[in-house]
Amino acid sequence: MTLRPGTMRLACMFSSILLFGAAGLLLFISLQDPTELAPQQVPGIKFNIRPRQPHHDLPPGGSQDGDLKEPTERVTRDLSSGAPRGRNLPAPDQPQPPLQRGTRLRLRQRRRRLLIKKMPAAATIPANSSDAPFIRPGPGTLDGRWVSLHRSQQERKRVMQEACAKYRASSSRRAVTPRHVSRIFVEDRHRVLYCEVPKAGCSNWKRVLMVLAGLASSTADIQHNTVHYGSALKRLDTFDRQGILHRLSTYTKMLFVREPFERLVSAFRDKFEHPNSYYHPVFGKAILARYRANASREALRTGSGVRFPEFVQYLLDVHRPVGMDIHWDHVSRLCSPCLIDYDFVGKFESMEDDANFFLSLIRAPRNLTFPRFKDRHSQEARTTARIAHQYFAQLSALQRQRTYDFYYMDYLMFNYSKPFADLY
């Protein structure tokens, strides 16, 4: 059958349209950015710590600035053959592989979106942070202060890891036991693990965790006894082996530390310079009986009136008449930072900035900020470096040196300067 000329022209035109369409589709696919076709992380950027969204698939989590009578040590049992590796803070400056110019531009844009979305980012903060109210930036903010806080975290983790590598080389091969995690509190909704260091803001941190867990609407509503004697927050050692290891490997682990001499003086002032129904009879009586010559009958009966040099004698005595207490124990013993890879290390001296940066990192509600009020003895001045020096001036140079030696690992791991020029 012979086709008419008009029919042939129509067939040719239709074939041309199909060919042009196929060629255009191939060209479009070849130019499309592969990062837009598959949702994946940008090469070279490892977002290991991610702001946490609330989770409801796990159950929600006493004590210490309250005077709970519990031993520091607990019976241990093996949990694993090695310490679970923690997650690192995001590292936005890792090098990218060589790419075409158009692809590089799209990757850079996508990278910025990821940084803004996932990493309100952290370098050394001055010991005296600004008195101006801290306004927590939203997820879309990435200003210079935020970057500085991110770099601070990187530096603190580096110093801590170097100290562990130098002095605790065997720690990474030890198994995690319930004793190692007995001071860690769990907040399941935002997947947070907080290691409690007494006299370093722990009361207010537990208030924050209770608000995060939905147990209170405001930190101001939570009384001291509720914080320390309630059972609202769970400790990590109350979970079974699988629950402990799961949380250690997937939750954001953080601790806050304080200059060791200031923390020690703060504990002494709180426990021995104010009426206390536990520390005076348990610790005070033993200290006075051992270290005060000709102690009065009344002092031996009540345990009140312990002086700072007597307290330091007890602290440094290898044959103490009464055991250690978490309020003046080493952070390296309380939180095992050479065994547990903490994601965030905050400092009491820069508490407001560090705490609110951490809250932004885990995507806490915008109206939740770290409380500024003093938990106990609110009319009394906080223990500062100046006040700590006044107390340590009561000691001999040898006692100061021995106390520094006692806390040497805490000074080293958390990069605190020597508080006295004659220390070595």
UniProtKB/Swiss-Prot annotation:
Glycans are attached at N128, N294, N367, N415. Its EC number is 2.8.2.-. Induction: Down-regulated (17-fold) in prion-infected cells. Changing R247H: In a colorectal cancer sample; somatic mutation. One of its GO terms (cellular component) is Golgi membrane. Optimum pH is 7.2. Residues 47-107 are annotated as: Disordered. Residues 66-77 have a biased composition (Basic and acidic residues). GO terms for biological process: carbohydrate biosynthetic process; central nervous system development; hormone biosynthetic process; proteoglycan biosynthetic process; sulfur compound metabolic process. It is an enzyme of class 2 (transferase). Predominantly expressed in pituitary gland. In brain, it is expressed in pituitary gland, cerebellum, medulla oblongata, pons, thalamus and spinal cord. Expressed in the epidermis. Expressed at lower level in lung, spleen, adrenal gland, placenta, prostate, testis, mammary gland and trachea. Residues 1-10 are cytoplasmic. 3'-phosphoadenylyl sulfate binds at residues 198-204, 258-266. It is found in: Golgi apparatus membrane. Belongs to the sulfotransferase 2 family. Catalyzes the transfer of sulfate to position 4 of non-reducing N-acetylgalactosamine (GalNAc) residues in both N-glycans and O-glycans. Required for biosynthesis of glycoprotein hormones lutropin and thyrotropin, by mediating sulfation of their carbohydrate structures. Only active against terminal GalNAcbeta1,GalNAcbeta. Not active toward chondroitin. This is Carbohydrate sulfotransferase 8. It comes from Homo sapiens (Human).
